[in-house]
Design a protein with these regions (language model features):
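Charged catalytic cores and adjacent phosphate/nucleic-acid-binding surfaces used
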Residues: 1-6, 10-16, 20-26, 32, ...
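A short beta-strand/loop micro-motif in the catalytic core of glycosyltransferases
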Residues: 36
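Acidic/Gly/His-enriched mid-domain segments of enzyme catalytic cores or analogous surface patches
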Residues: 107-111
Length: 235
């Protein structure tokens, strides 16, 4: 059985706090087999992770959390950035054209600036036959969502429309990587993709913090990373 976390942010996200190397190191320490770096509307972090992955003994899937007009979408295996603010359908078409696949991020969740896709938008998109093979899953568990009931609603929704279930951390700090994870048969990224397409992935809830602890941890880490960025930017 393999274990993956397919929703992790780095300092390439405006609100991320961890370097790519730190993310890879932490993922290996906690026993993850596969991760995806999914920075907000940016693929540079994923590209860096792909370059460094072999040094840490972990597989990396290139990804991006794209801001669509209707909410956030996790895209995987894309090679170029996709313009934010497009409709969900147009975004999915562009993911498809790059040979990628997508998962709806934290559907129905709210709070902390989360821009979540609603069931109506997802169902509307799935009416388009040309993208049914692109939108393959629902993030049925988000490990750092402060809206706990949204995970339950997401699981019920995913069951109803028969898409793959993923559990992810949505980590913006190093401490929460792996708080949500996806179990799959096998251990490689190729095995994971087979499980996603076969709808056989399983959600694993690894850990959970209170909303206060999630927010306070992010705040402290963000201050630390901001000082580090400032120091690097100084001549």
């Amino acid at each position: 059985m393999g274990l993956a976390d397919l929703h992790i942010h780095t300092i390439y996200s405006y609100d991320g706090t961890a370097t790519v190397a730190a993310v890879l190191r932490r993922a290996k320490e906690i026993g993850l087999d596969v991760i995806a770096i999914t920075d907000h509307d940016e693929i540079a972090g994923a590209q860096e992770a792909m370059t460094l992955a072999s040094h840490y003994g972990i597989e990396v899937i290139p990804g991006c959390e794209i801001t669509t007009a209707e909410g956030d979408l996790l895209a995987y295996y894309i090679k170029e950035k996709i313009k934010p603010g497009l409709s969900l359908v147009e975004t999915l078409l562009r993911v498809r054209d790059q040979g990628g696949v997508a998962i709806a991020a934290h559907p129905m969740a709210g709070g902390m600036g989360m821009k979540s896709l609603k069931p109506y938008s997802i169902l509307k998109a799935l009416k388009h036959k040309s993208i049914r093979k692109t939108l393959i899953g629902i993030e049925a568990y988000n490990g750092t969502s402060i809206d706990r009931m949204s995970n339950r609603y997401a699981q019920l929704f995913a069951n109803g429309i028969k898409l793959a279930h993923t559990g992810n951390s949505d980590a913006h700090v190093i401490d929460t990587i792996g708080f949500g994870a996806t179990e799959f048969d096998g251990s490689t990224a190729a095995d994971l993709m087979k499980s996603l397409l076969a709808r056989t992935t399983r959600v694993r809830k690894m850990n959970e913090w209170s909303a206060f602890r999630v927010i306070s941890s992010w705040g402290l880490r963000y201050i630390e990373s901001s000082f580090a960025r400032f120091s690097l930017a100084r001549p």
